[in-house]
Amino acid sequence: MNKQELLHMIKQSNRKRLLQRLFLAIPAALAVYFLIRTDGNIWVGFAIIGGVLLATRYFLSHEADAISRLSEQDQVKRVVTLQYHLDFLFITLLALVNPLAIRIMEWSWIPAVLIGGALLYILWAQEKLDQQIRWLDPEQPTRREIRRF
């Protein structure tokens, strides 16, 4: 299969999972609300966000497995898996650390700087990993190409 056929196949698969991802957004927003609220019980937010993070981890690992199967090289498979681990790390950072930092430091700019710095670092790391994939296997679709297609 050439790169365009692989991209088309990935896009069809992502459309099937879109509804599942949208259903995760509602409990995630509710959990962040409970984590930020200073007068409520924080454990409700932890329970909800824990379930959302487990489901997100399942979906991301399933997607990483599907995309890494497109290449026969072990190094490419490791890089693809690492990219999805970074995505999960950033989602966890957004879901747990940021609301708790906002809860503790209500009127501070520190949580925004932490999240902004983490976002820039992860975007930089993703770009470097995409470059490595292009170098290892030119026919393997990169994350950027998958998002654009």
Region spans (language model):
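Juxtamembrane "helix-exit" motif on the non-cytosolic side of transmembrane helices
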Residues: V32-G40, V97-E106
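Short, highly charged, low-complexity non-transmembrane loops/tails of multi-pass membrane proteins
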Residues: Q132-F149
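Hydrophobic core segments of alpha-helical transmembrane domains in multi-pass membrane proteins
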Residues: W43-L54, T92-N98, S108-L119
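Hydrophobic alpha-helical transmembrane segments and immediately flanking/interface helices
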Residues: I104-Q132
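N-terminal first transmembrane alpha-helix
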Residues: M1-E63
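Short membrane-interface loop/juxtamembrane segments of multi-pass integral membrane proteins
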Residues: L6, A66-F88, I146
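Hydrophobic alpha-helical membrane segments
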Residues: K77-I102, G117-I122
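Membrane-water interface of transmembrane alpha-helices
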Residues: G51-L70, W124-I133
